[in-house]
Amino acid sequence: SLGSPAVAEPAVIAE
């Protein structure tokens, strides 16, 4: 959600 820092988010990041 936030972008790079996966804070309380699933392992799926915008990378």
From Swiss-Prot:
Keywords: Developmental protein, Disulfide bond, Growth factor, Mitogen, Proto-oncogene, Secreted
One GO cellular component, as annotated: extracellular region
Compartments it resides in: Secreted
Record note on quaternary structure: Antiparallel homodimer; disulfide-linked. Antiparallel heterodimer with PDGFA; disulfide-linked. The PDGFB homodimer interacts with PDGFRA and PDGFRB homodimers, and with heterodimers formed by PDGFRA and PDGFRB. The heterodimer composed of PDGFA and PDGFB interacts with PDGFRB homodimers, and with heterodimers formed by PDGFRA and PDGFRB. Interacts with XLKD1. Interacts with LRP1. Interacts with SORL1 (via the N-terminal ectodomain).
UniProt similarity note: Belongs to the PDGF/VEGF growth factor family.
Role summary: Growth factor that plays an essential role in the regulation of embryonic development, cell proliferation, cell migration, survival and chemotaxis. Potent mitogen for cells of mesenchymal origin. Required for normal proliferation and recruitment of pericytes and vascular smooth muscle cells in the central nervous system, skin, lung, heart and placenta. Required for normal blood vessel development, and for normal development of kidney glomeruli. Plays an important role in wound healing. Signaling is modulated by the formation of heterodimers with PDGFA.
Protein known as: Platelet-derived growth factor subunit B
Lineage, broadest ranks: Eukaryota, Metazoa, Chordata, Craniata, Vertebrata
